[in-house]
Amino acid sequence: MKLPNILLTGTPGVGKTTLGKELASRSGLKYVNVGDLAREGQLYDGYDEEYGCPILDEDRVVDELEHQMQEGGVIVDYHGCDFFPERWFHIVFVLRTDNGVLYKRLETRGYNEKKLQDNIQCEIFQVLYEEAIASYKEEIVHQLPSNEPEQLEDNINQISKWIEQWVKDHNP
């Protein structure tokens, strides 16, 4: 049976991981958090002193994911999307969060002030939505609100319906 590949993207703190894990457990699709994948495989290309975090080796991440993406049925969670091959994804969801809510979430994570401000700016200017629109066909890119628990449930239901329909349409 053919299964779709889904990309969940958005600024850090918008709820990609919470949504992705819950969606995977309900749909049976495989969940891949690119940050965890990079950590486990040491898929890094240096260290960013300013942000206090490792720099992702994008080519190695793509190589690492290629086989499972070809098989299908994968939910990928990452705060960027411009380096993934366009052919990988059947749909892209950009999660959006109000600045006040996002600020509190990132503060709770212990982000330094520069990292906090840059991520809030990223959300204000819709940087990741613009990146998604530039990287994929516009008709497969959708924005979802992610401010409160009720919206999480709505998003799971909406994406689950989409998965069911995609499976029906692609498995005669």
UniProtKB/Swiss-Prot annotation:
One cellular component (GO) term of this entry: nucleoplasm
Catalysis performed (reactions): AMP + ATP = 2 ADP; ATP + H2O = ADP + phosphate + H(+)
Source domain of life: Eukaryota
Keywords: ATP-binding, Cytoplasm, Kinase, Nucleotide-binding, Nucleus, Ribosome biogenesis, rRNA processing, Transferase
Residues reported in the UniProt entry to bind ATP: G13, G15, K16, T17, T18, R109
GO MF terms, alphabetically ordered: adenylate kinase activity; ATP binding; ATP hydrolysis activity
InterPro entries attached to this UniProt entry: Adenyl_kinase_AK6, P-loop_NTPase
Subcellular location: Cytoplasm; Nucleus, Nucleoplasm; Nucleus, Cajal body
Keyword rRNA processing: yes
Enzyme class: transferase
Signal peptide: none
Known EC number: 2.7.4.3
Nucleus is among the record's keywords: yes
LID: annotated span: 108-118
UniProt region (NMPbind), positions on chain: 33-56
GO biological-process terms attached to the record: ribosomal small subunit biogenesis; rRNA processing
Subunit structure of this chain's protein: Monomer and homodimer. Interacts with small ribosomal subunit protein uS11. Not a structural component of 43S pre-ribosomes, but transiently interacts with them by binding to uS11. Interacts with COIL (via C-terminus).
Role played: Broad-specificity nucleoside monophosphate (NMP) kinase that catalyzes the reversible transfer of the terminal phosphate group between nucleoside triphosphates and monophosphates. Also has ATPase activity. Involved in the late cytoplasmic maturation steps of the 40S ribosomal particles, specifically 18S rRNA maturation. While NMP activity is not required for ribosome maturation, ATPase activity is. Associates transiently with small ribosomal subunit protein uS11. ATP hydrolysis breaks the interaction with uS11.
Protein family (similarity comment): Belongs to the adenylate kinase family. AK6 subfamily.
Protein name in UniProt: Adenylate kinase isoenzyme 6
Species this chain originates from: Mus musculus
